[in-house]
């Protein structure tokens, strides 16, 4: 939405501030090419920040891979579009890219038909590092505990799998 030079100017006031742990890109992921943010992410990496971006909630599996490669991401917020492409799933697993997934949001926004069909199980069983999160608590009436319970009740993930995801997510 914003011109890149405007974002660069805004961020110039924060570079070097050790109170920041990461950088994240969010908004309409299809508004402009992800490559436009490459310079900002190179600087963020130089500053030692963890690199994240909201991608793959609405786009394609190719968009997820492109974002990871172009921005050198450590983590992807959402990323569920990757489920449609086995080579992208393997790429995420092989490169240890974490997907921070918000199941209830994905169902309510129509990105996944229902919780039992959520691709988080596929990602987990394919070796992709996943975390379970809530998205906009007041809008989706959810929190992390409810997300775990809903995935379990839908038989998307077993109790053992959910516990493993929980433990790995704390690292």
Regions found by a protein language model. Name each.
Residues 116-153:
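C-terminal hydrophobic structural anchor segments
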Residues 103-109, 131-133, 149-154, 169:
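Short beta-alpha connecting loops at secondary-structure transitions
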Residues 146, 156-171:
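Mid-to-C-terminal alpha-helical segments outside catalytic/metal-binding sites
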Residues 1, 26-30, 56-60, 79-81, ...:
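Active-site beta-loop-alpha junctions enriched in small/polar residues
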